[in-house]
């Protein structure tokens, strides 16, 4: 079976780390063991430095990161990851399991920040080319639920400190994009943990079986 790219998406506190573990466990049970794991922003030395710049509220002192500068920083990190990790892995027959990818930018910057969607799509197509996830699991939670979980983990980063209105706009854009793309599967992540895990297992298992059909 040709290698695939699976991405896990969602608001802060949606449970992406747990979801990744379930995806890996499910794939292994299906006989798929050659995998690499990525996170965005990050995943390479350069991308991790960009991650610190864009997420650490103290990284640039009192200087405000403009919305468009933020977009370009995310894309710089993403391109580095795609070119140096994701593309080589897929070409080598290795499956890639990602914590976030371009859907995050379309939702957070396009929805939350209100940046022109055409500009974001044009930038995506120009710098990422044909690299797209084969399957995206969008873990849907309300900002109230997600941020409560995130705050329980400790100090919030620059994005996590945004307003509920910002996250409501981000969630709305996520749902809008998920409704338009059959490769994006929405999981109700407000359910009890075991129910969420079962939904992920079922989705991944059925999807892989369809690949074999």
From Swiss-Prot:
Record key words, sorted: ATP-binding, Kinase, Nucleotide biosynthesis, Nucleotide-binding, Transferase
Disulfide bonds: none
Record-listed E.C. numbers: 2.7.4.9
GO molecular function terms listed in the Swiss-Prot or TrEMBL record: ATP binding; dTMP kinase activity
Residues binding ATP, per UniProt: 10-17
Keyword Zinc in record: no
GO biological process: dTDP biosynthetic process; dTTP biosynthetic process; dUDP biosynthetic process
Catalytic activities: dTMP + ATP = dTDP + ADP
Cellular component terms per the entry's GO annotation: cytosol
InterPro entries, A to Z: P-loop_NTPase, Thymidylate_kin-like_dom, Thymidylate_kin_CS, Thymidylate_kinase
The keyword Iron-sulfur is assigned to this record: no
Enzyme class: transferase
Family as reported in the entry's similarity comment: Belongs to the thymidylate kinase family.
HAMAP family in the cross-refs: Thymidylate_kinase (MF_00165)
Role this protein plays: Phosphorylation of dTMP to form dTDP in both de novo and salvage pathways of dTTP synthesis.
PANTHER family in UniProt: THYMIDYLATE KINASE, UMP-CMP KINASE 2, MITOCHONDRIAL
Protein name: Thymidylate kinase
Species of origin: Escherichia coli O6:H1 (strain CFT073 / ATCC 700928 / UPEC)
């Amino acid at each position: 079976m040709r290698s695939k790219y699976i991405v896990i998406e969602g608001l802060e506190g949606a449970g992406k780390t747990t979801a990744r573990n379930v995806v890996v466990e499910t794939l292994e049970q299906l006989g798929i063991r050659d995998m690499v794991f990525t996170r965005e922003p990050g995943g390479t030395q350069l991308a991790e430095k960009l991650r610190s710049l864009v997420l650490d509220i103290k990284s640039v002192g009192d200087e405000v990161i403009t919305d468009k500068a933020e977009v370009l920083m995310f894309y710089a990190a993403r391109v580095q990851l795609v070119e140096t990790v994701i593309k080589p892995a897929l070409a080598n027959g290795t499956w890639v399991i990602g914590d976030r990818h371009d859907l995050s930018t379309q939702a957070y910057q396009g929805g939350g920040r209100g940046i022109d969607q055409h500009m974001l799509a044009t930038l995506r197509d120009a710098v990422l080319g044909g690299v797209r996830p084969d399957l995206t699991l969008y873990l849907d939670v309300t900002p109230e639920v997600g941020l409560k979980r995130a705050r329980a983990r400790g100090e919030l980063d620059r994005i996590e400190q945004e307003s509920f209105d910002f996250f409501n706009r981000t969630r709305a854009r996520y749902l809008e994009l998920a409704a338009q793309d059959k490769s994006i599967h929405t999981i109700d992540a407000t359910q009890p943990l075991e129910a969420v895990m079962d939904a992920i297992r079922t989705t991944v298992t059925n999807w892989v079986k369809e690949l074999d059909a």
